[in-house]
Design a protein with these regions (language model features):
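Active-site helix of classical SDR
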Residues: 2, 37, 45
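Alpha-helical segment proximal to the catalytic Tyr-Lys
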Residues: 7, 50-54, 119
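Residue(s) in the substrate-gating loop at a strand-loop-helix junction
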Residues: 21
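Active-site loop immediately N-terminal to the catalytic Tyr-X3-Lys motif
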Residues: 26-32, 54-55, 98, 103, ...
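Active-site loop-to-helix junction immediately N-terminal to the catalytic Tyr of the SDR YXXXK motif
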Residues: 27-36, 47, 75
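C-terminal helical subdomain
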Residues: 61, 69, 83-117, 121, ...
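Short, flexible catalytic-loop segment of classical short-chain dehydrogenase/reductase
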Residues: 64-74, 134
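Short C-terminal tail/terminal secondary-structure segment
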Residues: 111, 122-152
Length: 152
């Protein structure tokens, strides 16, 4: 999409907003392909920002954490079934704000990045994850043995 839109943006500038993930900023266990793909989106975004900034084209990426969407229902189960309840409970536990994000919150970030209010922001990957990535290691927050298996 970027390849085809850049020529149209050359005269008037604009804002490109790519969707990455916090998994592109720090690797998730057993998700190497996904981590690499999202890390690639982040570095692609930075490259576009550098290459086209003089044309008044800004490029940023959003890096959502766990957002309450149908994708979460498909991958982890709905908020009504046991698997979905367990997944959501675990996500809330490791999130300093104690909840999952909402699509509306992500949309507001995208709207801000598309607006002139963010005219001096480019080449950034902005996490919207409720503070999950503020921890050096999620196990620090858990205070129990749930993460010991991944340190061996």
């Amino acid at each position: 999409v970027t390849k085809f839109l850049l020529p149209l943006m050359m005269d008037n500038g604009g804002s490109i907003i790519n969707t990455a993930s916090f998994s592109g900023q720090a690797a998730d266990l057993y998700r190497s392909g996904y981590n690499a793909a999202k890390g690639g989106v982040i570095n692609f975004t930075k490259s576009i920002a550098i290459e086209y900034g003089r044309e008044n084209i800004r490029a940023n990426a959003i890096a959502p954490g766990t957002i309450e969407t149908p994708l979460v229902d498909n991958l982890a189960g709905t908020s009504e079934d046991e698997a979905g309840k367990t997944f959501r409970g675990n996500q809330k536990w490791v999130t300093p704000l104690g909840r999952l994000g909402t699509p509306d919150e992500v949309g507001k970030l995208v709207s801000f990045l598309a607006s002139d209010d963010s005219s001096f922001i480019t080449g950034e990957s902005i996490r919207i994850d409720g503070g999950v990535m503020a921890y050096t290691w999620p196990g620090e927050m858990l205070g129990d043995d749930r993460w010991k298996h991944s340190t061996k």
